[in-house]
Amino acid sequence: MDKKALSYLSISQKAGLVVTGEGACEKAISSGQAKLVIIASDASDNTKKKFSNKSDYYKIPNVVWGLRDEISRAIGKNNRPVAVIIDKGLADRILLFLRE
């Protein structure tokens, strides 16, 4: 797990730029508000497929990365297999760290 990416995820949450929860994430994606979809690698296959397909359809970058517990801890919430970043700059920064 990339510590810099986790730090930026935490900063994004503190700035109010992370959407979590299945319904809220779906709404953010379909409304065009989402800039990056992060899906935990230990999320269910159904969740991975659902959010991967939805973000692909709306042409929003998505990444299967990290564990549910690590993502949840970074954003200060329990049991969050999906997180949506709604700020382009922070989304780009997180993707940059993940690609290093």
Task: Report each predicted region and the residues it spans.
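Mid-chain, well-packed structural core segment of small domains
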Residues: S52-R80
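Short, ordered loop/turn segments at secondary-structure junctions
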Residues: G23, D42-A43, L67-E70, K88
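Structural motif
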Residues: G16-L17, K35-L36, P61-V63, R80-A83
